[in-house]
Amino acid sequence: MSDPTASPVASLAPAPSPVASLARTYADVTEVRASDPAAVAKAWQRRTTRPTVRGDGRLMIVAADHPARGALAVGSRPTAMNSRIDLLDRLRAALADPGVDGVLATADVLDDLVLLGALEDKVVFSSFNRGGLAGSSFELDDRMTGATAASTAGARMNGGKMLCRIDLDDPCTVSTLAACARAVDELAAHGLIAMVEPFMSNRVDGKVRNDLSPDAVIKSVHISQGLGSTSAYTWMKLPVVDEMDRVMESTTMPTLLLGGDPTDPDAAFASWQKALDLPAVKGLIVGRTLLYPPDDDVAGAVSTAVKLVR
């Protein structure tokens, strides 16, 4: 496992699964990647999968696809996500909670986790478009540079997630919409969930900003839930904003609430609790708020979120 001086949560990461682990340490992960890269695909085929919805129908998903977009900051910590080993420690600590149903991440992170045996009986969502790097001049030209429907199906995952930022003043938006529509159809053809995360966005002083007003979120939902030739497998991933009851009247799609970049975790938990009572809301899909709490108590933050969902 990692050097505990490098990761404040290293001691919380569980031992590798005896069922499917092909790597016991992070050094093992690198060695497997170097000497037997085909073992990654084998690990995905050996993994015990599970249906997305079971039991009470609620979901608690941990998200970790931010680094692939170059978004490494958390709150006031600009380099919080620099260390992959530290991130993996935090993810493994979160996934060890039996109330956590699964994870959303890019292939690099998911492959590490599957080699470590951390994805047994977990829901897994791949991440599709990471091309619009944070802060870049081409940020809204958000091309599909991550997973595909074929790779997601081949690894026996539950679905794929795509960001759909809509800037009415940026001509690249139409390409993003078309790419998301294709991804919705391709996932549906495999019987897999298309998790769509929409925002109305614009540039303010050169930086892309998401409009989190209720009416803007409602408009983004209407645009994005109409993508593709079928909505049978479409789910929404939405921010918690003011007038959330009105926002949720805009869709019949199953919806997971996202966390965003935390500024006040206590306020975030309170807002989630209220929104989770709305009928179409099926749970949380949260990353930085749970993985990088101010006190670095990942297990405590995750436990609090699980109690809200369950």
Question: Predicted regions: what is each one?
Answer:
Residues 65, 105-106:
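Active-site loop/lid in soluble adenylation, ligation, and acyl-transfer enzymes
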Residues 258-259, 286:
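Thr-Gly-centered strand-to-loop micro-motif
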Residues 284-291:
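Short acidic/histidine-rich active-site segments
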